[in-house]
């Protein structure tokens, strides 16, 4: 057995305790066994490392890749994880991103990756950074607990976990208070362990334009920002301090607006709500892909995706652009039944308008007390109610 060192003018990497053959004619080393570690990233060679099986190195290249390695991180878990390994001979800031290990499995469970925070999904170690990797199907899951009960579940294709911060550009969020919850399919997610604070940002103009759903109060809420210091009772809903006047709308999922119903149709022969409802009846599922719906509707896929996104932004369904899947919401059926006079409806809407904006802090429009479930809304000048049919 030998210790193998590979270097160029940009950097180097090492493989210890390996053996193999070097083929001069094609400049390749074919190895069996050996160990690689993360010693250059500050961890001891017996705490974070990978054992190699069969591998090949093209000495004309500056990188080395190995499949089916057994990875160990004794700081995080007590079992080996099988996956692929990559290292490059690079210098400067690029060197911080190597070595890389990526697990094959996407259902690895790690408890207390931070205090009261569990993880399930794929495992990637890029340099010194743990990447919670769900790949393309948003299967990486962060679970935050409080007093032994889960208070938040976040699903994403990827979470970045650095020191005391967990971040995702887009995560499906379910925030629990007892048996009820607030839900949104795509929010920017930040959790600070040092502050024990959760921040959820919703881009009203982007793919996350759908309103937030509150199951207890049966409301949709188009707040831009949710903040919660999880040791406190109140969840804050509001917006960023970017304008002189800030508005947040709260709307009953049993509400109906005839003008909105007709505006959805445009020049279409069939109202989109009816088309989706008919598809659900024929397919037998409320969760479907954009490709499945495009095939049913007879439209090209590039037209169906914005079609579904528009319905999502108005709260009739949730549409996940990372997976191109839709989940029909109760509001869609309420609208159809109200239009056909098959059910009662209301026009309960609250418009919260805040004008006394000071400083750079969050503009608070509403507070939800997780114990009493009271929802206090600021800046409501009037409430218009109608009689149910």
Go through the PLM ranges and name each one.
Residues 1-389:
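Structural signature for solvent-exposed beta-strand/loop edge elements and short helix-capping sites
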């Amino acid at each position: 057995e030998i210790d193998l060192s590979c270097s160029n003018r940009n950097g180097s990497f090492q493989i210890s305790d390996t053996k193999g053959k070097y083929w001069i004619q094609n400049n390749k080393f074919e190895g069996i066994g050996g160990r690689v570690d993360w010693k250059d990233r500050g961890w001891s060679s017996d705490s974070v490392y990978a054992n190699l099986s069969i591998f090949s190195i093209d000495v004309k290249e500056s990188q080395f890749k190995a499949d089916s390695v057994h990875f160990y991180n004794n700081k995080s878990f007590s079992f080996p994880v099988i996956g692929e390994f990559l290292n490059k001979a690079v210098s400067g800031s690029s060197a911080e991103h190597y070595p890389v290990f990526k697990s094959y499995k996407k259902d690895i469970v790690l408890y207390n990756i931070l205090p009261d925070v569990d993880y399930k999904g794929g495992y990637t170690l890029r340099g010194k950074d743990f990447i919670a990797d769900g790949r393309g199907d948003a299967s990486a899951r962060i679970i935050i607990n409080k007093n032994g009960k889960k208070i938040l579940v976040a699903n994403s294709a990827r979470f970045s976990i650095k020191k005391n911060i967990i971040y995702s550009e887009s995560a499906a969020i379910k925030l629990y208070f007892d048996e009820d919850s607030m839900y949104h399919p795509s929010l920017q997610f930040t959790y600070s362990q040092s502050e024990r604070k959760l921040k959820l940002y919703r881009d009203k103009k982007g793919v996350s334009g759908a309103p937030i759903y509150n199951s207890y109060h049966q409301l949709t809420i188009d707040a831009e920002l949710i903040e919660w210091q999880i040791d406190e009772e109140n969840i804050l809903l509001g917006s960023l301090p970017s304008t002189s006047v800030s508005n947040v709308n709260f709307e009953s999922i049993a509400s109906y607006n005839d003008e909105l119903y007709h505006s959805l149709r445009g020049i279409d022969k069939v109202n989109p709500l009816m088309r989706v409802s008919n598809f659900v009846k024929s397919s037998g599922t409320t969760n479907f892909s954009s490709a499945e719906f495009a095939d049913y509707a007879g439209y090209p896929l590039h037209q169906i995706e914005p079609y579904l996104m528009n319905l999502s932004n108005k709260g009739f369904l949730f549409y996940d652009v990372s997976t191109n899947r839709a989940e029909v919401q109760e509001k869609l059926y309420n609208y159809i039944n109200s239009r056909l006079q098959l059910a009662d409806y209301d026009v309960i809407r609250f418009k919260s308008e805040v004008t006394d904006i000071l400083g750079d802090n969050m503009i608070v429009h509403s507070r939800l007390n997780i114990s009493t479930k009271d929802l206090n809304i600021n800046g409501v000048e009037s409430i218009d109610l109608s009689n149910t049919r």
